Amino acid sequence: MTDLPPADAPVDPELDAAEIEGDESQSEAGGPDESTWRRFDVTSEAGEGLAAAQAAIAAGECIVLPTDTVYGIGSDAFSAASVQRLLDAKERGRDMPPPVLVAEVGMFEALADEIPSHAMRLAQAYWPGALTLIVQAQPHLRMDLGETRGTIAVRVPDHDFTRDLLRRTGPLAVSSANVSGKPSSTNIDDAVGQLGNRVQVYLDGGATPGETPSTIIDFVSTSLGKVVRQGALSLELIHEVAPFVEGIESPEESATLADASEPAGTDPVEAASDAPDEGVDA
């Protein structure tokens, strides 16, 4: 991979907010008109891609980024307008709030309130990785992700480029890079085809491992933990670290549990791991 510039490197001055905003048509349903978005290969154009993505996030725009599960669409988690832009791009309501991706466990501790011991053990064991943890958010946290009811879903992705980006931008609200009800994107062309000029910067990391999303564990309804979506991290591995986490017996139960609890990032439709055509969070 091309050497990455230091995390405190200045943003390219040519990528100012006025240029990033581009055509207002990006806020409407639009096709992949490349005049309003830019694409970067994260291997051969790592530095340029990081700078462009950082500038887009700072300007309140959306980006598409690779993860270790599926491609995600991301925006500034601390900007309500940016999160709404993400939801609009996905044609998704505020009742389906996106999870938050962070670069390291320390940021999880900063965002969450009184993390249960089992949750912290899982984070330390399986992050970076395909595990999303739902916990109570800090009461004074200035995030408006949607109807979270005081919860937050957090993950550290196992993708070097994306974690480096997160160190520069801070926490990002990230959902799967697809229109709700459409297949998840496992390559950048899938994402471009669905989201087009609703996104300012596309970061091409090649094909993802597949359509299986992260496993989601709810630590709000019980401090011991309950799986509300079975994804890439198996229950067997979870039980090696936290043996009392409650599993699920079927994808149908996964959707039912998510519907009943509805904490951040567990949309009842998008939670079902056997229904990739409904779209799933990264």
Segments and roles (model prediction):
Residues T2-A282:
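Active-site-adjacent structural elements in enzyme catalytic cores
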